[in-house]
Structure formats: C-alpha cells, structure tokens
Amino acid sequence: MIDKRDDKPFKLKSKYKPSGDQPQAIESLVDNIEGGEKAQILLGATGTGKTYTMSQVISKVNKPTLVIAHNKTLAGQLYGEFKEFFPDNAVEYFVSYYDYYQPEAYVPSSDTYIEKDSSVNDEIDKLRHSATSSLLERNDVIVVASVSCIYGLGSPKEYADSAVSLRPGQEISRDTLLNQLVDIQFERNDIDFQRGCFRVRGDVVEVFPASRDEHAFRVEFFGDEIDRICEIESLTGKTIGEVDHLVLFPATHFVTNDEHMEQSIAKIQAELAEQLQLFESEGKLLEAQRLRQRTEYDIEMLREMGYTSGVENYSRHMDGRSPGEPPYTLLDFFPEDFLIMIDESHMTMGQIKGMYNGDQARKQMLVDYGFRLPSALDNRPLRREEFESHVHQIVYVSATPGEYEMSQTNTIIEQIIRPTGLLDPEIDVRPSMGQIDDLLGEINQRVARDERTFITTLTKKMAEDLTDYLKEMGVKVKYMHSDIKTLERTEIIRDLRLGVFDVLIGINLLREGIDVPEVSLVAILDADKEGFLRNERGLIQTIGRAARNVDGHVIMYADKMTDSMQRAIDETARRREIQIAYNKAHGIVPQTIKKDIRGLISISKTSHNDISKEEMDYESMSRGERKEAINALQKQMQEAAELLDFELAAQMRDLILELKLMD
C-alpha cells in the first residue's frame, strides 16, 4: 500500500463567522461525532447555511469525509463551495463520468439487443482518478459525490499495489519503467500527449497521470538509475520544479497483475463452461452460441491487452469475490474511521435504496438470453444494507428528513435561524372557488412592488391553461415544464430575476437552483390533494421558496385542511416563532437575501450577447456565420466544463453537432 503523507489538518477559510443557531448546531454535531454517535440529523431550514455548518464540522472533527448529493448539479455546487472553504486541502469530485450513457440491454418481445453506448467526459474521469489517488495518499480529503459512488469501482488494494513509485537515485531501467506503465494501462503516444499516456525521448520518459490535466512529469535516467524527476507543463514541456517522490496510479480503476489475470481468466472460463452446459441442456442453442462467442472474444482481449470493453462485468472474478458478495466501491478507498454526510437526505437515501433493483432487472435479461455470464449480476450498485455496513459515522442533512433517516437516529440537531434574520413565510389557506381571480389580484400587488411569484399546480394541463389565462390578463408569465433542459431552465430563472417576466408556473418547483430572493409569493393550487408534492415534506419544501424574501408569503388554495397541510403549517409557525424571538432578543432586522444573478445560473450565458438556440435563427445563417457561432459555443462549452456545469456543457455539445450537420 502507499505510504500516506503526514497528517495535515483541515483548515477552513471563510470571511463568515458562525451566527444564529449555527454555533449550537456545530457544537452539538462535533460533540456527538467525537462521542461516538453513529448517526444524527442536521435539520436545517432553507437558507440557514447548512453547507457552512457542514464545513465547520469537517474542520473540527478532522476526518476524511464523503459528501453525497442526489444529482450532478447539486454535487457540483457543493464541490465549488467546499473548494472555497478548504483551498489548502484535497476537495475532490466523484460523479458518473458519462455525458451520455445507454446501458447494455435486451428486449425479448422485439428480439432487440441494445449495445452499450456512452460518451465519457474526460474532465470528470480525471476528477475521479484525482479522488481515488488523494484518498490513498493523504487524510485531509473531502470527496463530494453523487450516488454513483455506490457503483462498482475495482479493488482499492489492486489499485494501490499496482501504483508505480519513483524517486531520484532509484535503480530501475528505462525499459522496466515502460513495461510497468503499460501494465497499469498507460498508453505510449509520442505525438498526442494526454492523460493516461507516456512518451519516450532517449533517456527521458514523460508521463501524464490520469488524475492531472495540465501538469505531467519528466523522469530522466542516467544508465539504469533515475537521475531526477521534474513536474512539467504538459503543453509546453516547461519545467515547474523538481520532485523527490512520484507515485503513478493506474490509468483505469479496473486493473490487475498478470498472475491474477490468468487466475481470473480461468474462473471466467469455468463459469462459461458451466453456463454453456446449462443452456445446451435446456435447448437454448442460440443463447449458448452467443455467450460463447462474446465471452471468448473478451477473454482473448483480456489476455492480450489486459483490458476489454465491458471489463467491469468480470469484476467479481478479477476482484476474487464470491457470488453475491458486494463490489468494491469508492467507499472502500476511505479509511475505516471516515465521516459520511448525506445532503438533501430525503432525496438521496431514496436513490441509494432504488439503484440495486433497477440494475438487476436489466442485467438478468442479459444473462437469461446469453449476452452476459451470471457473474455480471455482481457488477452492481450496493444494496442499502450494504451501504449501511460501510457507515462508521453519518450525518443526514435536510430541511425535511425522510422516514428512513428518522428511523436511524433520535439525535436531531435543528438549524432554524437564518444569518440574514429572515423568517419562514406567513401562510394563508383560501378556498379554491374564485382562486384564479384572487390569485390575479395578489400577482398584481407583487408586480407593483417589483416582486416575483411562483405558482405550483398538480397537472400539466392546469399549468398550461393558467399560463394562457394570465397572459390574456396582461401578466408576464412563463411555464416551466419537465421537458425544459438545463440551458433553457437557467435562462428562465435568470429572466425571472431580471424582471423579463413576473410569474413562473410549474408542477415541481422543488428542483435545485430555483431559490429566487425576488420571489415574495408562492401560491400552491390544489394544496389539499395528497401526494408526493402535497405531502408534509413537499409542502414544507415549497413553502421554503418564499423564505428568501422579507415579504415572503404563501397562499394554499384548498377546500379542506389535510393532515399534511396542518403539519406543514404548524411546523412553519413553530420555526417562525423561534426566529422572531431570536431576532427580537438580538435586535436583528430581517433583510432580503442579496444574490448575484449570474451566480445563480452558473454560466448559461456569459453575457446578454452570447449565443443560444432559442434566440438565434441558425438555419438562415451563412456558412461563415454558423462557423463563428460554433466557435463561440465551443468556448462556452469549455467554460461550462471548467466550472463543472457538465449538463450545460453537454447541451452546448449537442447544439454544436446540430450546427455542423447543417453544412
């Protein structure tokens, strides 16, 4: 295994000081962790600074920490915030590295085999390698991940044992180093020097680690001894400085040595023979022929190249696991005494629970029809109970914790006071009879004060009809439906904040990135229709959308008071009472949050003049104009990727492809 660097403490850098009930929450969380408490809940109201509290806890308990979010967008936002809080420590990002992913599948009803098709994002792949190498080299590591962290990753022991350790003065021939690099899946490329490659110039070997994007390393030999090792700029070759120790981790997470590979191949062949015998005994000759052809090809590739497309489907044999045994995941790269924080746990824990079943249903079909060996079923995400077995200490973070989290612990730390002094909004319940005219009057009041309104409906038809009616009444309104992609969605939020329109209508306004301080009214139609968006948790989340404005107000239109409505109203009133008392005791006057508009939407536009599909008539452009548009979009795509807004970058990429097809 790799010798870790000397322990370096987490050092939090921030211009803010804990305020409101953050100090109490931080102290309680830290005391409980240091006291050995396994699970606890940080129940933080919207806008109370939960991420800052999490950062304070990490800096004080000083443990390697895994922060899990329920999608890439949220993970990217958290990654950016933690990078700012901990500039001197290793803050890493680990999400699925696919821009596009079509899993391998088979549909028996139409005899359709769908081959795996994917597009790997090179930047995210680099960040994944950076995360695993940091975990093996140091302890001051925060990894912000999506639920993809519970998917199979390869053995951390094999990954670490395969690493190549180099020092000046070390006796090793140049050719031996080259062979070692090939063994850990580095490719020789003397022309196109990129991640996961090396090039050779006489007695000089330059290596580009899989975890880097700008800096590579030059290893200079004198005979069969390393003379010196330098860090260099990958593009220019300019020397940055000398290093006294270089560890090169494998270029792929699925790696094994030659001896282990032969053992793995023998196991694959034995399983193949067993499955072929089963198919033939059942008269499934087509399935047997299909399985033999595919598996023997993969075996040949593994033997000759040490790798094959879909190698993860043989991970059980390569890792030496028993049938049904859980795969190695990112969690196995952490030391035993690490901390897990689950952001928006009411969403994330549900995802963790659901991943396994969906994966197994698809793969079982591939096994039954001879596309994969049964061992492919063990290349899978963890079950929830297997995830739980990795938990040493965990903090669930949510404004509305789910039933699962509540069943895991009685330790609940509340964070209700906002640093800005803002209160949870007042709530009115009004009858549905005449609700549209009543709502129109409320909207006009907000428009007169240059404030915005959210309206949430239960059906697409209701949202569309209401949008049409309000437009007829002269209201500037837009409807945000599920088909709207990231680029358009961020454009809509930006326009709402700028006052291009005043009212936003949607079915699910709980998604990330739509906390708008200018919104002073949230109207909930059909509030008495129980369901996912009208249960206590959904209502509290929706109510929170009005908690960023000092004049925040919520109107529920309903003909009866449901239990969910009553509990949401009671909980909001309880929090509001606590907040009022705190403000009064400390002489705090609530203030609307001031939030930079561009910061809200990342970089969907770098300026008003940037190019988007909605605004430009590309078909009427000349070829030269389209070429200019493509260049501008490529620049925006790179900027999006650098800021980790990969969904937006993918949108830009798709638009660029469309434009290229026009020529």
Swiss-Prot record:
GO terms for molecular function: ATP binding; ATP hydrolysis activity; DNA binding; excinuclease ABC activity; helicase activity. GO terms for biological process: nucleotide-excision repair; SOS response. Residues 1-23 are annotated as: Disordered. The keyword Nucleotide-binding applies. It comes from the Bacteria. Coiled coil: none annotated. GO terms for cellular component: cytoplasm; excinuclease repair complex. ATP binds at residues 44-51. Residues 1-10 have a biased composition (Basic and acidic residues). It is found in: Cytoplasm. InterPro entries: Helicase/UvrB_N, Helicase_ATP-bd, Helicase_C-like, P-loop_NTPase, UVR_dom, UVR_dom_sf, UvrB, UvrB_inter. Residues 627-662 form the UVR domain. SMART domains: DEXDc, HELICc. A motif (Beta-hairpin) lies at residues 97-120. Forms a heterotetramer with UvrA during the search for lesions. Interacts with UvrC in an incision complex. The UvrABC repair system catalyzes the recognition and processing of DNA lesions. A damage recognition complex composed of 2 UvrA and 2 UvrB subunits scans DNA for abnormalities. Upon binding of the UvrA(2)B(2) complex to a putative damaged site, the DNA wraps around one UvrB monomer. DNA wrap is dependent on ATP binding by UvrB and probably causes local melting of the DNA helix, facilitating insertion of UvrB beta-hairpin between the DNA strands. Then UvrB probes one DNA strand for the presence of a lesion. The beta-hairpin motif is involved in DNA binding. Belongs to the UvrB family. HAMAP family: UvrB (MF_00204). This is UvrABC system protein B. It comes from Streptococcus pyogenes serotype M5 (strain Manfredo). The lineage of its organism: Bacteria, Bacillati, Bacillota, Bacilli, Lactobacillales.
